[in-house]
Amino acid sequence: MAEDTVMPPVHPGEILLEEFLTPLGVSQYRLAKAVDVPARRINEIVHGQRRITADTALRLSRYFGTSERFWVNLQARYDLETEKDRLGTELDGIRPLSEAS
């Protein structure tokens, strides 16, 4: 019988690396130059050490031909899942308004 395993949230940088850079043969440095940002920014995103900001989302979407919302939504989903994990059962103590009356 398989154990229930909770997968950690996937950082948008992992998506950037695994779904875009690696398959397309684009280096982090090449991407940074193409979208006019410091190479360190791309490296930190790829390593999960930096968020994808609106500025970066606009640049990535232009370069890869995706929507801006694609990148922003990846980051928002990651942020929500990470925060949900951090809060743990603390949210269980909050009664919804409809149940509070």
Annotate each PLM feature.
Residues 23, 34, 63:
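Residues within the alpha-helical elements of helix-turn-helix
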Residues 26-44:
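Short alpha-helical DNA-recognition segment
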Residues 38, 49, 64, 75-78:
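The DNA-recognition helices of helix-turn-helix-type DNA-binding domains
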